[in-house]
Each structure stands twice: as C-alpha cells, then as structure tokens.
C-alpha cells in the first residue's frame, strides 16, 4: 500500500515540476490518475460493487483520453503560452479537489469540456478572437492546477482502513523506471534579428535595394 502511495506522490510531483513541458506533465498526470483509478476499481470490485467499478473505469478512461488530446489544443495556443503564466491563478478551477481526491477526475472533465467547447466554437472564428476567449492560463489550470491540488492531499487517508488490492508489480516497475528518467529541457527558440534581416535581404545585390541603406545594413 505504501509503495503505490509513494509512487503516486512522486508522479504528481514530477508533473508539477514539469508543468511548462506539455508532454511530460501530461504523461506523469496520466500515469498517476491511472494508478489511482486502478486502486478505486479494485476496491469497488472487492466490495462487490460492479456498478461503482464501472463508473470509475469510464470516468478514468474519459480523463486519460482527454489528456492525450492536449497536444492538439496546445498547438493552437503555443505562441501565447508561458510556463508559469497562470500557476498562481488556477485556484478557482480546482477548488473541488480540496474536499476529496475523487473529485479531481470530475474537475478534469469539467475543465476539459469547457475548453473543448470554446475550441470548437472558435475554430469558426478568427484566430485572434480565440486567443481572447480561451486564454492559455485555462490550460495551465487544467493540468498543473489539478496535479498540485492532488499533491496536497494526504494520500494515506486515500487507502486508510482498507485492504489494499495488489497492483501488477511489472506496472509499478515501469512507473519507477519512468520516474528515474531524466527530462530534457525544451529547446527555446531565440529571435535573431541579423539572421532575419539576411533572409529578408537575400536576392538583392548590395546597393541595389532602394528600401534599405547598404551602409546602415
């Protein structure tokens, strides 16, 4: 029991630490939520509550499915995203998770559905309008906000007084292997005015371009 709790904590911490790296944050969160869902499913089955187990399984599938679509959304917003832009502004999005770990899945679905609705509507409008309606901090709240709120939970109470179902040791080994993997920092594009000028001025012979003074250039 303590082994799985420790791994969930590590996964949430890793997602939080890499909130500026879309893929790493998404991957760590997906694994952590899968482990938590697996625990809840097995507990429901042990208590002979198949309907509850099915409900948890469906909710878990929807959330991880949504997480896989995150790169598509961030492609549209990439030019306007800063890693720490809204890290302190997500409280309103994740307030429900302060009451219960179970609510985290509901909050994730709620946030995603709102973002998806905005995305679908704005695809028919100008890109600039989309930037105003669906700001980047909404995405930041979706992933890093939830993982941060979850990390604050006392995970021990999550499994307290319950016979913990054993999760496949192979899967736990894979999780540990992922946790040990180093995350390479993302390459940041830097603006090079000189290179941009040379590209713009390519094809002109020096002195023949009347729009740019060769001496100044």
PLM regions: where:
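Long alpha-helical, hydrophobic tracts
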Residues: 1-58
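Extended, helix-rich structural scaffolds rather than catalytic motifs
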Residues: 1-2, 45-217
């Amino acid at each position: 029991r303590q082994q799985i709790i420790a791994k969930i904590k590590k996964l949430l911490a890793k997602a939080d630490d890499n909130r500026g790296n879309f893929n790493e944050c998404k991957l760590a969160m997906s694994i952590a939520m899968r482990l938590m869902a697996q625990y809840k499913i097995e507990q429901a089955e042990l208590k002979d509550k198949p309907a509850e187990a099915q409900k948890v399984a469906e909710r878990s599938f929807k959330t991880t499915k949504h997480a896989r679509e995150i790169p598509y959304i961030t492609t549209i917003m990439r030019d306007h995203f800063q890693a720490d832009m809204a890290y302190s502004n997500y409280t309103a999005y994740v307030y429900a998770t302060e009451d219960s770990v179970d609510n985290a899945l509901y909050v994730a679905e709620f946030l995603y559905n709102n973002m998806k609705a905005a995305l679908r509507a704005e695809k028919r409008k100008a890109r600039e309008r989309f930037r105003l309606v669906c700001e980047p901090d909404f995405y930041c709240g979706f992933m890093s906000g939830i993982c941060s709120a979850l990390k604050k939970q006392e995970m021990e109470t999550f499994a307290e007084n319950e016979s913990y179902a054993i999760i496949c040791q192979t899967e736990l080994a894979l999780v540990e292997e992922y946790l040990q993997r180093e995350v390479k920092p993302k390459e940041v594009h830097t603006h090079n005015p000189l290179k941009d000028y040379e590209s713009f001025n390519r094809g002109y012979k020096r002195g023949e371009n009347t729009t740019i003074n060769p001496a100044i250039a």
